[in-house]
Curated annotation (Swiss-Prot):
This is Large ribosomal subunit protein bL32. GO terms for biological process: translation. It comes from Tropheryma whipplei (strain Twist). Transmembrane segments: none annotated. Belongs to the bacterial ribosomal protein bL32 family. Keywords: Ribonucleoprotein, Ribosomal protein. The lineage of its organism: Bacteria, Bacillati, Actinomycetota, Actinomycetes, Micrococcales. GO terms for cellular component: large ribosomal subunit. GO terms for molecular function: structural constituent of ribosome. Pfam families: Ribosomal_L32p. The keyword Ribonucleoprotein applies.
Length: 65
């Protein structure tokens, strides 16, 4: 395992760490009952009835959990 030759200053450590950022997730758009619905494509989404009650979960066009 590599061992650093010199101590890295607090300022350099924090400057390096500040570059690590979370990327914005890409939302997918879907029209449901005339209204746009945005969801994450890699997650299961809830399918609701006309009253807003949850019927089941769907992922990649299949019923899950």
């Amino acid at each position: 395992m590599a061992v650093p030759k010199r101590k890295k200053s607090r300022a350099n450590t924090r400057a390096r760490r500040s570059q690590w950022k979370a990327s914005v997730p890409g939302f997918a758009r879907l029209e449901e009952r005339g209204r746009p619905v945005f969801y994450l494509p890699h997650r299961a989404r809830r399918i609701l009835d006309s009253n807003g009650n949850e019927l089941f979960m769907e992922y990649k066009g299949r019923r899950v959990g």
